[in-house]
Amino acid sequence: MGDTIKELLNPTVLSALLMGFAFSMVLGPIFIPMLHKLKFGQNIRKDGPQSHLKKSGTPTMGGLIFFISVTVTMLIIGYKPTDEGMVVLYSLIAFGIIGFLDDILKIIHRDNLGLRAYQKMILLLLFSIALAYYGYTNIGTDIIIPFMNSKLNLGIFYIPLVVVYYAATTNAVNLTDGIDGLASSVTVIVLTFFAIVGFKTGHYQVGVFSIALAGALLGFLRYNAFPAKIFMGDTGSLALGGAIATIALILKMPLFIIIVGGIYVVETLSVIIQVTSFKTTGKRVFKMAPIHHHFEQCGWSEVKLVTVFSIITLILCIIGFIAL
């Protein structure tokens, strides 16, 4: 543990954290008025919480802020194109591009219909297969089983399972981004967990990237926390999902997403349960889904929701360390 703490206090690590944070803090006041001027505002669904309707027109695509911040940070640090940290950056960019296209089309059409489902699925499949192949040839097909102190070799099933894993993780983070600051706050904690594990297991570059992205998200939170001046949009949420999935894949810890990313999992399950129940019985289990909207309908404020979900994520990450 002492060596891990030393790594966290390493000048490169501290520089990555501070640069990511500083770049986001600087870019926020540049992007917010620019997106306002371009009329790149969020269209709010009328079937969502009524309290959210007043947020219509809030600048979206704010994911570009931490997207650019972490990219510049990694380039300044000077990693080679084939380094592990850069592979995570490529995944951030790849899935961020899908989100960017989705956001742009929503803005152009002035509704919440961006990329068609099949278009998004094709792009997700292309990038997921590429990253699954990278994992198959460079990382190995074994993954760590939580609490078991052992590994499971997926063999020929590795690539198809990893493709499903990417689709699930990116969409789960996307669903979590439904109230001001929620996805950002939860993901900062998850990234910190993976950074510590990265340093502890010798994946230094993955640790540095995780810290840089956590710093960039903290800077972004200055503008994304309630009341949000900007939303990350699909540009940000899909990028974060792709990056987290790749970080866990390199560390051979995809199964740990279920634990430390428990909030992502619950958000996704709430939607699946709600849709299944309504289609089969005509009744809803929750007042609204994803589940953060259910709690909003129960009277919880956005600040309370973010605080409680963040504390839960912190506890889940502690459990994640126990599961190693």
Swiss-Prot record:
Catalytic activity field: UDP-N-acetyl-alpha-D-muramoyl-L-alanyl-gamma-D-glutamyl-meso-2,6-diaminopimeloyl-D-alanyl-D-alanine + di-trans,octa-cis-undecaprenyl phosphate = di-trans,octa-cis-undecaprenyl diphospho-N-acetyl-alpha-D-muramoyl-L-alanyl-D-glutamyl-meso-2,6-diaminopimeloyl-D-alanyl-D-alanine + UMP
Keywords: Cell cycle, Cell division, Cell membrane, Cell shape, Cell wall biogenesis/degradation, Magnesium, Membrane, Metal-binding, Peptidoglycan synthesis, Transferase, Transmembrane, Transmembrane helix
CC per GO annotation: plasma membrane
Sequence intervals crossing the membrane: 13-33, 59-79, 85-105, 121-141, 143-163, 179-199, 201-221, 243-263, 303-323
GO BP term, example: cell wall organization
Bilayer topology: Multi-pass membrane protein
EC supergroup of this enzyme: transferase
EC number: 2.7.8.13
Functional pathway: Cell wall biogenesis; peptidoglycan biosynthesis
Cofactor(s) named in the record: Mg(2+)
Pfam families per UniProt: Glycos_transf_4, MraY_sig1
A GO term, aspect molecular function: metal ion binding
Subcellular location: Cell membrane
NCBIfam families assigned: mraY
Entry function: Catalyzes the initial step of the lipid cycle reactions in the biosynthesis of the cell wall peptidoglycan: transfers peptidoglycan precursor phospho-MurNAc-pentapeptide from UDP-MurNAc-pentapeptide onto the lipid carrier undecaprenyl phosphate, yielding undecaprenyl-pyrophosphoryl-MurNAc-pentapeptide, known as lipid I.
Family listed: Belongs to the glycosyltransferase 4 family. MraY subfamily.
Protein name (record): Phospho-N-acetylmuramoyl-pentapeptide-transferase
Organism: Clostridium botulinum (strain Alaska E43 / Type E3)
Lineage: Bacteria, Bacillati, Bacillota, Clostridia, Eubacteriales
